[in-house]
């Protein structure tokens, strides 16, 4: 057998070593910031911390979870991510189902596809988008964060290709013969079969919503409505500890680097927790949604 040959064994060993090195490169920064967050300010500021805490302390974590501003931003980030993911999945699913039909079933399908690809490559720009959001009365609301990017064309094309290649046409035709409508076919045939693609698109959307900070900085005038990513950007980039709501003595006792590390790790934690539950669908969704027979 070919998998018993020497060439195949060498190739397998190389793959395993390469993946182990790649995994270490991805994991080591997280371990480092976690170690810094549990270290005392002096060794952290002196760059003495590598992958294990020095002079272990939880002061940075106590300060992070002890102030209402951070907890409010954490809740805003979770709410924005959940709402944005649900809206995006709903709109993308409906659009992908319609666009997956043949030209004879959906007149003007090609025109819509060309328009979607065009706006994916050439968007309206920051200022026109801001003016549109302002005229719609969405400034300083959660809708300004989730509606402008609700239909991601890349995710739409991924799900569209899955609908066209992964759902047997015979099932759809049989359902039509039995008198089923489009919504029944979508919810009872397409969606159950398309769980891998939906999980993939949902993961992409979730990561994008959770990590997005620039739109919050533009559209939100009230800092109490900032999602966690925008909140962290304000503190980390501008070194603005006033939003931590601590007195000067506590600020002196803290290290900006330890607090920043704790907050960065917390910011990455939700996606790290969610990913293992979607992993079994992820690879299958990418493969089936990116090829066409």
What are these regions (language model features)?
Residues 1-293:
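A hydrophobic, multi-pass inner-membrane permease signature
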């Amino acid at each position: 057998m070919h998998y018993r040959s020497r060439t195949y064994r060498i190739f397998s060993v190389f793959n395993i070593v390469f993946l182990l090195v790649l995994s270490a490169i991805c994991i080591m920064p997280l371990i480092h910031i976690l170690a810094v967050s549990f270290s005392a300010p002096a060794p952290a500021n002196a760059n003495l911390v590598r992958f294990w805490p020095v002079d272990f302390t939880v002061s940075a974590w106590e300060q992070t979870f002890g102030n209402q501003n951070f907890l409010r931003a954490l809740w805003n980030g979770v709410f924005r991510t959940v709402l944005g993911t649900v809206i995006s999945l709903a709109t993308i699913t409906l659009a992908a189902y319609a666009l997956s039909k043949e030209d004879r079933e959906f007149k003007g399908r090609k025109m819509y596809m060309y328009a979607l690809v065009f706006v994916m490559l050439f968007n309206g720009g920051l200022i026109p988008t801001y003016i549109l959001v302002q005229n719609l009365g969405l400034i300083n609301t959660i809708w300004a964060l989730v509606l402008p990017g609700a239909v991601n064309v890349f995710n739409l094309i991924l799900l569209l290709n899955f609908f066209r290649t992964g759902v047997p046409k015979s099932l759809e035709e049989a359902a039509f013969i039995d008198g089923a409508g489009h919504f029944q076919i979508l919810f009872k045939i397409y969606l159950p079969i398309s769980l891998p693609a939906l999980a993939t698109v949902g993961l992409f959307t979730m990561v994008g919503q959770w990590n997005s900070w620039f739109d919050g900085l533009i559209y939100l005038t009230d800092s109490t409505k900032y999602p966690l990513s925008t909140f962290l950007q304000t503190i980390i980039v501008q070194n603005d500890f006033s939003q931590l709501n601590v007195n000067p003595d506590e600020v002196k006792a803290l290290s900006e680097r330890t607090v920043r590390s704790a907050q960065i790790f917390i910011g990455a934690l939700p996606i790290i927790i969610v990913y293992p539950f979607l992993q079994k669908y992820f690879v299958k969704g990418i493969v089936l949604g990116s090829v066409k027979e």
